[in-house]
């Protein structure tokens, strides 16, 4: 592993820093990526100073399946890759307006967030894979330009990106680019640890541990696939286990990956899913974040079939998928435009209460579909 000398996001460091700041003179929203303060310190303070009375006040976003470079050649008229990349940029503009949005007016999230102010600026945004459409060098360059790790305009909050099945194999430009990107984030203090090859990463925000395992948590290539193919998870399960071994069983953990957790999925096989479950079932996993399906969902892992196959005992974990930037289109029809102006899961943890709500930029901001009650979520993350 490639650890930092210390985790700059540790709770002890956070409290000692805040203790010498005057609340009257400090405003986290005046900090920028060019602040004379170190970038990691600036973003740390953003994540904790919005709610002075709370021991923890952490906000982060989940988006997925950007598919930069998608070319709708068969729509009428064709909607090319440059037009699609402009669509991505417009979606990012919408995302930049999420901070300051009032929470849903009713329901469990509204109740939990009463008196705690609107959506704060996030500590960061996680992009759960399929960053590009075909994983070539041009598409990677465009993704890295549109969503740089330092933060895209106008959001200016860090972007944590994962490789998906559209992003090519171990030697391809996307995974190679992610390695360089991760090294930059390590140097800036935005991640605490990288895997030996720098593809997988881990960091801590206000005592909440985040682990990025990219495509899915596994060791060894899928049967029949080449070592250099996208089917190589590059020892992500070993990395996950090594991180969890350093984390107490009751400490909150979030795991981010691309592939989904459905028992019907054939993208990663049953033995690998079981090995993953065995690795995490003794830990306080407060959220599993994923993409791949393009669906907006909140599910439980393991589902009933897998749960029975895994022995029928042990915890189940909450899984979240935010949707996609890439809409479905029909041959011979016009480009349909996005399903919503944007699709983003917004998470906030205040003290030991986690809330999650799906943001679409509809009137009022939040998802109002028939599935909205299922997507809205509140839970206590403290192990009793």
Labelled PLM ranges:
Residues 15, 31-40:
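Bacterial N-terminal signal peptides that target proteins for export
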Residues 40-48:
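Bacterial N-terminal signal peptides
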Residues 51-138:
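N-terminal active-site segment of His-dependent metallophosphoesterases
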Residues 65, 129-130, 164-165, 258, ...:
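Active-site glycine-centered loops adjacent to acidic/histidine catalytic or metal-binding residues
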Residues 136-239, 275-281, 287, 295-358, ...:
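Extended active-site neighborhood of metal-dependent phosphoesterases/phosphodiesterases
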Residues 247-264:
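Short acidic, glycine-rich surface-loop motifs adjacent to enzyme active sites
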Residues 256-260, 286-296:
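Histidine-centered catalytic micro-motifs
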């Amino acid at each position: 592993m490639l650890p930092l000398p210390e985790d700059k996001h540790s709770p002890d460091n956070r409290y000692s820093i805040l203790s010498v700041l005057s609340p009257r003179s400090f405003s986290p929203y005046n900090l920028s990526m060019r602040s004379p303060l170190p970038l990691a310190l600036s973003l740390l303070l953003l994540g904790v100073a919005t709610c002075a009375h709370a021991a923890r006040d952490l906000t982060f976003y989940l988006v997925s399946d950007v598919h930069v470079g998608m070319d709708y050649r068969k729509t009428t008229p064709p909607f090319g890759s440059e037009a699609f990349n402009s669509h991505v940029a417009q979606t990012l503009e919408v995302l930049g307006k999420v901070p300051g949005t009032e929470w849903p007016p009713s329901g469990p999230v509204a109740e939990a967030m009463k008196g705690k102010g609107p959506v704060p600026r996030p500590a960061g945004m996680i992009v759960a894979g399929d960053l590009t459409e075909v994983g070539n060098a041009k598409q990677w360059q465009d993704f890295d330009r549109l969503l740089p790790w330092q933060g895209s305009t106008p959001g200016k909050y860090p972007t944590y990106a994962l490789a998906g099945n559209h992003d090519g194999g171990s030697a391809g430009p996307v995974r190679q680019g992610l390695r360089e990107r991760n090294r930059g984030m390590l140097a800036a203090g935005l991640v605490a640890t990288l895997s030996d090859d720098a593809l997988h990463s881990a960091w801590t925000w206000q005592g909440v541990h985040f682990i990025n395992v990219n495509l899915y948590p596994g060791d060894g290539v899928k049967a029949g696939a080449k070592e250099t193919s996208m089917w190589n998870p590059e020892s992500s399960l070993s990395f996950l286990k090594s991180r969890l071994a350093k984390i107490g069983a009751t400490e909150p953990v979030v795991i981010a990956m691309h592939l989904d957790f459905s028992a019907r999925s054939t993208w990663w096989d049953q033995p690998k899913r079981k090995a993953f479950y065995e690795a995490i079932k003794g830990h306080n996993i407060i959220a599993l974040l994923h993409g791949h399906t393009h669906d907006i969902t909140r599910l439980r892992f393991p589902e009933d079939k897998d749960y029975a196959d895994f022995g029928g005992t042990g915890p189940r974990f909450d899984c979240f998928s935010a949707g996609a930037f890439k809409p479905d289109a029909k041959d011979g029809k016009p480009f349909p435009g996005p399903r919503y102006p944007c699709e983003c899961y917004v998470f906030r943890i205040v003290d030991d209460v986690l809330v999650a709500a799906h943001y679409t930029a509809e009137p009022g901001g939040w998802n109002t579909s028939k599935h909205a009650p299922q997507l809205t979520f509140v839970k206590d993350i403290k192990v009793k």
